[in-house]
């Protein structure tokens, strides 16, 4: 499971399946200003604030799945190519198990996760520590610069070795 939450602007950025890759696991549109502050949770556990309504948008990139939290009486299919959703409001602080309630293949048994419902203060502390899409882009730009420097240095060293042997 992976999760994306709206950032400070309160709006999720738009996404497209064609944008999904290792550098953009959620497929967020790079040109959408609302996506820059989206909070990215690449973990099996999502934290939620108690007594706040939550709208879950579900999508799948491979096969049919089902996000199920028995204690919330919440169960919804995640269908490839379709966004499904439902609303709920967690009202009891605690930890709850997320299950995939749709047989989805050989890895089905491992499709477990968690929901941690927290007080407002704990949730705000947790959310402030999470990575945003803007942070992810910045990290990738730094890595690209470092890779270019390494490639340039390796090319220089390689040329130096070639000239040395002649």
Model-derived features with residue positions:
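Non-transmembrane, membrane-proximal soluble domains of secreted or membrane proteins
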Residues: 1-166
């Amino acid at each position: 499971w992976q999760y994306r939450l709206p950032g400070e602007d309160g709006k999720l950025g738009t996404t497209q399946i064609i944008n999904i890759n290792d550098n953009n696991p959620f497929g967020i549109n790079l040109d959408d200003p609302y996506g820059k502050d989206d909070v990215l949770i690449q973990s099996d556990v999502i934290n939620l604030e108690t007594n706040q309504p939550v709208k879950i948008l579900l999508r799948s990139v491979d096969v049919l799945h089902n996000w199920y939290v028995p204690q919330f009486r919440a169960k919804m299919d995640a269908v490839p190519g379709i966004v499904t959703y439902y609303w709920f409001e967690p009202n009891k602080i605690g930890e709850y198990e997320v299950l995939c309630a749709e047989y989805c293949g050989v890895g089905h048994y491992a499709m477990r996760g968690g929901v941690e419902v927290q007080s407002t203060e704990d949730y705000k502390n947790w959310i402030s520590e999470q990575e945003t899409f803007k942070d992810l882009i910045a990290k990738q730009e730094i890595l690209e610069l470092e890779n270019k420097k390494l490639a340039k240095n390796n090319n220089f060293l390689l040329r130096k070795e070639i000239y040395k042997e002649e």
